[in-house]
């Protein structure tokens, strides 16, 4: 099972260090066999070398080694920090920052060429969801245009936009139906994200169509994230 915590723009270097130390100790003490990933804020990406049991990834990077891309991080900087995992296509970057499907695909191609583990996000708006399951699947598949679905280090996270940060997760029936339809087109792991928390993670991950979870705000407290790991 794959569990990934996305801190977004939360936590400082100090609090991230504290979080990772406690999480690493917990994973060691419980002999955790799950694959645990964490996407911290960019200023804490250098906590890679001495933290065991957790794979650290970047929430974003520009598809170039370096260059005149103000405010961005390139692969040259990530290489120095030994980062080999990246999150691409999150709805907040698509919606708030205007990242197009073409740009997400460009990022994918570039970081796939470098052998990165890629968490690639897809998800629909409430308007699309209300149009029915066929419209929902068409929309999500359109967000996979330009993505090599046979790439061996690809992990896809289905995150319905209307469930992200709202506290309202998709129903188990919606998750199961959507994952089953998407899996007909995929061979890679398919995670669920969207208001996953302590109260619903066990039942969501009990669905055979779900291979793990990408967790946002509910993962910000290390005690809660550890409890979620224990529940699966």
Swiss-Prot record:
Signal peptide: none annotated. GO terms for molecular function: triose-phosphate isomerase activity. One of its GO terms (cellular component) is cytosol. The keyword Isomerase applies. Pathway: Carbohydrate biosynthesis; gluconeogenesis; Carbohydrate degradation; glycolysis; D-glyceraldehyde 3-phosphate from glycerone phosphate: step 1/1. It catalyses: D-glyceraldehyde 3-phosphate = dihydroxyacetone phosphate. Homodimer. Belongs to the triosephosphate isomerase family. Involved in the gluconeogenesis. Catalyzes stereospecifically the conversion of dihydroxyacetone phosphate (DHAP) to D-glyceraldehyde-3-phosphate (G3P). This is Triosephosphate isomerase.
